[in-house]
UniProtKB/Swiss-Prot annotation:
It comes from Legionella pneumophila (strain Paris). HAMAP family: Leu_Phe_trans. This is Leucyl/phenylalanyl-tRNA--protein transferase. It catalyses: N-terminal L-lysyl-[protein] + L-leucyl-tRNA(Leu) = N-terminal L-leucyl-L-lysyl-[protein] + tRNA(Leu) + H(+); N-terminal L-arginyl-[protein] + L-leucyl-tRNA(Leu) = N-terminal L-leucyl-L-arginyl-[protein] + tRNA(Leu) + H(+); L-phenylalanyl-tRNA(Phe) + an N-terminal L-alpha-aminoacyl-[protein] = an N-terminal L-phenylalanyl-L-alpha-aminoacyl-[protein] + tRNA(Phe). Its EC number is 2.3.2.6.
Length: 222
């Protein structure tokens, strides 16, 4: 399925050693969806052109392979309130100030605007963790087919982002989703069960999962 019929990205296999595939262009919702459908994602710093990446290797998390440590097991017993798609703009704004990739803010105002539009279109979703009335953790990403493409997560109290990821995995497993794309390998996510695969394998898995219809709309859980 072509999400942006006016533009097609280069073959991901032609990216450089760091995974950089293309530079520039406009960050529109349709173009972002087209990128994800080809195993590509935007990642760039404020003031710079849009950079489009397709790294090799790739990090994914199979929903039923999430690992729960002893400390996280204790945290999961706390009376958090778990919600989906009730505070998307707050979650992405928190992530913009609590970026996990670098110490710099990479979630630009342009990205916030585009992903908020994707949320309104039913493609971008947020998972929220509440301690009473306080938003203490969460994550957001894109859903296509039976795949969830994680973008960023945040926490204001210890392990709240891990609670959000566990929540995501539980929902994805119940909906028979195939994998969560974690993009770049990190020890933090690998300790939680994520695994490294080749780009070739990732692209094959992606094309298989895109055979399923997109689960669009405002998500909710009981």
């Amino acid at each position: 399925m072509a999400y942006d019929s006016d533009y097609t990205f280069p073959d991901p296999e032609t990216s450089d050693k760091q995974g950089l595939l293309a530079i520039g262009g406009v960050l529109t919702p349709k173009r972002v969806l087209q990128a994800y459908s080809q195993g590509i994602f935007p990642w760039y710093e404020p003031g710079n052109p849009v950079l489009w990446w397709s790294p090799n290797p790739r990090l994914i998390l199979i929903p039923n392979e999430f690992k729960i440590s002893r400390s996280l097991k204790k945290t999961l017993k706390k009376p958090f309130k778990l919600t989906v798609d009730t505070a998307f703009q707050r979650v992405i704004s928190y992530c913009a100030t609590c970026s996990d990739r670098t110490n710099k803010t990479w979630i630009t105002s342009e990205m916030i605007e585009t992903y908020t539009q994707l949320h309104e279109m039913g493609y971008a979703h947020s998972f929220e963790i509440w301690d009473g009335s306080e938003l203490v953790g969460g994550l957001y990403g894109i859903s296509l087919g039976h795949a969830f493409f994680g973008e960023s997560m945040f926490h204001t109290i210890t392990d709240a982002s891990k609670v959000a990821l566990h929540f995501l995995c539980s929902i994805m497993q119940s909906w028979n989703f195939d994998f969560i794309d974690c993009q770049l390998p990190t020890l933090h996510l690998m300790r939680l069960g994520a695994k490294i695969i080749s780009r070739k394998e990732f692209l094959h898995m992606l094309q298989e999962t895109l055979k399923y219809p997109d689960k669009k709309g405002n998500w909710s859980v009981d």
